[in-house]
Amino acid sequence: MHGLAPLEADVEVAGRTDPAIMRDLVTAAGGADVDARWPEVAEAAIAAYEQLAPDDLSERVAPGIVELLEALAERPAEFRLALLTGNLEPIARLKLARAAIGHYFEPEQGGYGSDHHDRAELPAIARERAGGWPRERTVVIGDTPRDIACARADDVRVAAVATGLFSVEQLADADAVVDDARALLPVLHSWHSWGQSPLGTRRGSQRRPKPQT
C-alpha cells in the first residue's frame, strides 16, 4: 500500500509495539508517511494477520501459562487478569482466541499497541481501564527485557518467564524470574499479601528481595 519494494529489514521486534515495528519497517523500505497514513497501515496489518495466522495457535502457548491463568481466574477476589501487549488490539484478541485463552481476559480491559506506540505507557493505561487499579497490587508478567522496562516505567512489580526467547540471566532485572509459568503462583500469592500492607514498590523505596526461582 506504500508502493515500496519488499525487503528483509533488520528491525527488532521482541517486546515492542506493532506501531513502532511498522514505522521502522516502512522507514527502512524508504517510506516517510507512515504516521499520516497510520489508519490504513493498521487496517492492512490486521487484515494480513487474519489471513496469514494459523487457525490453531494453542501449541504456541508457553508451558504453564494455561495452568497459571486457570489458577488465577479461580481467585477473582484476589487477582484480576488484564492483557498487556504491544499488538494492535484486534490482532491481540485474534491471537488469544486462536490460542484458546481469550476467555481469561475481559473485553475493554488491558493495554495494547493500539493505545500507544510506546510500551512504557501501557501499564498505566491498563490500570486506568481497571478503575484506577493501584500500583502496589499490579504485576506485569512478561518474557522480554522490554516487559521489565515497561513495568519499571509505571513503578509496578514485574515477573519474568524465560519462555526461550530470552534466558533467565537476560531477565534478571525482574523482581522474580522463573522458567515455567506455574512457578509464579506462589510468588504472586506472596506479593498479594504484601500488597495489603503499607509496604510498596514505589520509586525510592527499598525493593523486596527476589523470591527464589
Located regions from the model:
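Substrate-recognition "cap/lid" segment bordering the active-site pocket of phosphatases
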Residues: 59, 82, 87-139, 145-154
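Short amphipathic alpha-helix with an adjacent loop that forms part of the alpha/beta core around
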Residues: 185-197
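Compositionally biased, intrinsically disordered low-complexity segments enriched in Pro/Arg/Gln/His
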Residues: 196-202, 209-211
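Short, acidic loop-to-helix structural element flanking the phosphoryl-transfer center
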Residues: 51-83
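Glycine-rich phosphate-binding loop signature in dinucleotide/nucleotide-binding domains
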Residues: 74-79, 130-136, 191-194
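Acidic, Mg2+-coordinating phosphoryl-transfer loop and its flanking beta/alpha structural elements
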Residues: 140-178
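Conserved phosphoryl-transfer catalytic core
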Residues: 1-30, 48-49
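Short acidic-hydrophobic, aromatic-tinged amphipathic segments that line or gate anion-handling sites
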Residues: 111, 176-181
